[in-house]
Design a protein with these regions (language model features):
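Ferredoxin-reductase
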Residues: 7-103, 159-161, 185-188
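Reductase modules of NAD(P)H-dependent flavoproteins
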Residues: 8, 14-17, 152-255
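A short, basic/flexible loop-to-alpha-helix module at the beginning of a structural domain
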Residues: 110-121
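Short, conserved phosphate/pyrophosphate- and ester-handling motifs at nucleotide-, phospho-/glycolipid
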Residues: 49, 133, 224
Length: 255
């Protein structure tokens, strides 16, 4: 999740302490997105699908706060956030364009108990992401791989262009293994030899991805609010139980 989340549990959130996070390393994922590897003393650990709040404080005391999904798998020994640049944002421009290893900021978390996946869950896994909504879904896939889970896992990712696809090489590796990965591009012409989809996510696409509702899959949908609402609606229309369609949405600020 990248932006202001539409989430509950405000009371529990406010009880979490702010911690000092230091950037240990930075990786470029796309021309507009970077992954920050953080050192956070006292970090209690997290579950796949959770997120954190980040707070920046300017020299004049002005503070800006945004929420970002955790990209790293639980138990990996890393805390990683992938941040996509929002041109008119207050936080993402600093994190993607100005921040350097050794810089620090305040961090609060982990947050969230609804949009999480654990290897003990035996149900097939259907992941649907829009843009940077793939970040918490990647944490789930990384956790699945690290724990040796053999749960049926499928990922459908929507991106504007192939250059906007986060974790592209890693996704190709997962697709060559035990994860069914399909990408749909929504803008411009797809590259030569493209074997994915080239349209917005629709009912036919979701039905093709499966697993069928009769198998009782757990679906996790993350992305901008309109994307999530439409994908969740289509999944329910296809017969998926609403209680098994977990959603995480970006808020209106989009930063």
């Amino acid at each position: 999740m990248e932006g202001t989340a539409v989430l509950g549990g405000l009371g529990a959130r406010l009880r979490l302490p702010w911690r000092e996070a230091t950037i240990r390393a930075i990786r470029e994922e796309t021309p507009s997105a970077k992954t920050l590897v953080l050192d956070v003393p006292g970090w209690p650990g997290h579950a796949a699908g959770q997120h954190v709040d980040i707070r920046l404080t300017a020299e004049d005391g002005y503070q800006a706060q945004r929420s970002y999904s955790i990209a790293s798998a639980p138990g990996s020994g890393e805390l990683e956030l992938t941040v996509e640049l929002i041109d008119d944002g207050e936080v993402s421009p600093y994190l993607t364009e100005d921040a350097l290893p050794g810089d620090g900021f305040e961090l609060r978390g982990p947050i969230g108990g609804y949009f999480v996946w654990e290897p003990r869950l035996p149900d097939p896994l259907l992941l649907v992401g829009g843009g940077s909504g793939v970040v918490p879904l990647m944490a789930m896939l990384r956790h699945r791989r690290a724990t040796g889970s053999t749960v049926d896992a499928r990922l459908l990712l929507s991106a504007r262009t192939i250059e906007d696809v986060l974790y592209r090489e890693e996704l190709e590796g997962l697709a060559a293994g035990s994860v069914d990965v399909r990408i749909t591009l929504t803008r411009g012409e797809p590259p030569p030899g493209w074997d994915g989809f080239a349209r917005r996510i629709d009912r036919e696409m979701l039905a093709e991805m499966g697993p069928p509702p009769a198998e009782g899959p757990r679906a996790y949908v993350c992305g901008p609010t309109p994307f999530v609402e439409e994908a969740a609606r289509l999944l329910v229309e296809l017969g998926h139980e609403p209680a098994r369609v977990h959603t995480e949405r970006f808020g209106p600020t989009g930063d």
